Structure formats: structure tokens, C-alpha cells
Amino acid sequence: MTKALDGVRVLDFTHVQSGPTCTQLLAWFGADVIKVERPGSGDITRGQLQDIPKVDSLYFTMLNHNKRSITLDTKNPKGKEVLTALIRTCDVLVENFGPGVLDRMGFTWEKIQEINPRMIVASIKGFGPGPYEDCKVYENVAQCTGGAASTTGFREGLPLVTGAQIGDSGTGLHLALGIVTALYQRHHTGRGQRVTAAMQDGVLNLCRVKLRDQQRLDHGPLKEYSQFGEGIPFGDAVPRAGNDSGGGQPGRILKCKGWEQDPNAYIYVITQAPVWEKICDVIGETGWKMHPDYATPPARLSRLNEIFARIEQWTMTKTKFEAMEILNADDIPCGPILSMKELAEDQSLRATGTIVEVDHPTRGKYLSVGNPIKLSDSPTEVKRSPLLGEHTDEILRDVLGYSDAHVAEIHDSGATAPPRKQAAE
């Protein structure tokens, strides 16, 4: 079956997480992604957080499925020759180097356009143009500078980063959308273009409801936040609001049966207005249906702590799955707190390809996330990540059309192998 991005060839200069997230998505949709790696070492994540000695880490394997790997010393003249040929052949170049690295390699935007005017050059940086553009950024730095940390956690506690990789993987998702948009525009213009995504920008985009609330503060307190009901004044910036819902409909994480032993025996419950009377029935507070202090959403806002404490009395008598079954029967929005162990063992996620089992030649079988985006006419088959330089000869021959003699010449030049260490005299 033809894949959505069949015929698109991507030159992948990315490393660690943000860039590989982007290029893995493109590969899942059928693009031929050629990962260019440093001879002898490759992507640094091959050796980071290793759980099995001398085997590519899960950090690497889970971010580089469906790709091909070529090792190339881009400082070597023959290596530069190969890279130039790849730029001429590929549709997209993706990189998440520090600012200016690609230029110092001799491949400025102008040079790349000279080689291939149809080339799309996509870049992830920590910050956009401005006072911080030369600063190094990692996941948690992006969360802290993009508005996530200042609005995550509890009011009297430290700012917190989230377990979701919204800085790295989130920006990779944004860049992938930018790339396919640029590819579509190229059909009309015939020209390539630059696509950039800054990690700070990506995090802020995902925190848009907090920017919404920042402006609402100019007109009064945020009444759906817990501190309103507690009578605590608001400052001039959006506060941390614990587990309060950010969507305008009050919600909290509540204890369930077994919470004393199980750190994940909790459920999230939302007191949505259309199902308020059903909530009252479930928890045995039928008198609240018509009581002026509880009957309307505005009346309930100052009493949310009391209301959720009462709902929690009920949820503590049920397991999180029992509570979910009862609440869902009445269309009451809720969701159990699922551990990674529970998710890994969820057969429904296996059936949809959201979690997949992959077989690797040195690691063996392991679990990975699959493509979260499902296309009816372009299903994703998750294939293992490449070994370092596994496809070097294949790419030189099949993509660039080099003869056996030319391939041997490239190898003999040292362009595909780590530099030899000279013995001390």
C-alpha cells in the first residue's frame, strides 16, 4: 500500500529528542529518512540511559524507528562531497544543531538553495530571534521559559515541570506540521523554504489557556481556580492551580479505594454543568440539585473544595475502574490515573498500534509508542531503529548511484569511519 509521504526523501541531521521526534513521524508516514551520524559514535542517545551494555539505548531506539543510518564525517572532503550529493537528491533537510552550526559546516541557506532550490530546510532551536537565541535549551529549560513550569504545581509549592515532553517532542510535532505544509506549498511554487520551530514557542503554544487566563486576570479573579473559593486574592500573574481543570469546567484528582498503598489509585472527575444532577444522585446529595448554593455553576464556584471533598468521600469507596464505570454510565467526565505499567499492559492500545512491540537485532523485543495519528489509507508499520551506519553502502549505491569503485574510494578516504588514533611516540 502506498504511504502518505512515499517519494519524499529527508536528510536527517537531528539528534537527541526534539528533531528525531519530527523525523520519526515523517518516516512513519512513509518518507525515506536518511539519518546522518558521526562515524564511530552516532547520535549521542545511542549511549545514554543504557539498560543493556553495548546495545543501543531505548532512548535512541524509540525515537528513530523506520529510518536509515549513514555515517559521514562532514569535515572530510569526500564526506562533504557525499553530503552535497545528498542535499541535491533530498527534499527536506532537518536539523536541531546549535545556532550557526550548519553555516560553519559550509552549508548556509544560500549554499543549500544553490545546490537544490527545491530543498526545504527545517530547524529546531531553543529560542527564536531575540536576547536568548544563542542559549542552549533542553526539555525542562523549554518548559520553564515557555510558561509551563510557572503554571504547573500547587500554589504554595515550587514551579514544576510536567512528565510529558512538551518541549522536545512537542516542538518536533510542530516542526513536522511545518514541513508537510512547506511540501504542499512547494507543489504550487516549485521552491523550497526555511521552516523553523523554537522550543519556547512550542511550549507557549501548548500553554495558550494560561495566556488566556493572564488576560482574564485584568477583569477579575479566576473563579474556577481553587483559591477563589478559599478567599485568597490573586496576584498579577497566573498562579499555579494544582489539578484544577484548565478548560473552564471544574475538575480535580480524587482518591479512590486503595490509595493508601497504590500511588495511582486516583481518578479525575469533572463537575460538568449538564450532568450536575446525575453527580448529586451518584454521591447521594439529591438536596443539592435545587439548593441555591449548589444548583447553578456560578453558585458552585465558591464551594468547589466542599463539593469535591464530598465526591471524594464516594470515590474512596470504589476502585478507580469501578468509579469510572459508574460515572461513565451517566456521561460524567472522568478518567483513572493510569500508571506506565498499566498502559504498557493495555491490550486495547496494542490493538490500535498506539503501543507496539518491536524486535531489534541486538536488544531483542521491546515496547515503544506507535504513531498517535492514524490514517485510514496510510497505516503505520513501526520498524526498528537502524544500527550505526547500517545503510551507508546502500545509500551510497541506491540513492546516490555510486559505483562499487566510488563507494570504495569514499571508504578509503576515511569519510565514513572514525578517525584513527595515532599511538603516542
From Swiss-Prot:
Residues annotated for substrate binding in this entry: G247, G248, Q249
Enzyme class: transferase
Residues annotated as catalytic: D168
Keyword Transferase: yes
Catalytic activity: formyl-CoA + oxalate = oxalyl-CoA + formate
UniProt keyword terms in alphabetical order: Transferase
Entry EC no(s): 2.8.3.16
Chain residues that bind CoA: 17-18, 38, 72-75, 96-98, 104, 136-139
Quaternary assembly: Homodimer.
Function: Involved in the catabolism of oxalate and in the adapatation to low pH via the induction of the oxalate-dependent acid tolerance response (ATR). Catalyzes the transfer of the CoA moiety from formyl-CoA to oxalate.
Family from the record: Belongs to the CoA-transferase III family. Frc subfamily.
Protein name per UniProt: Formyl-CoA:oxalate CoA-transferase
Organism lineage: Bacteria, Pseudomonadati, Pseudomonadota, Alphaproteobacteria, Hyphomicrobiales
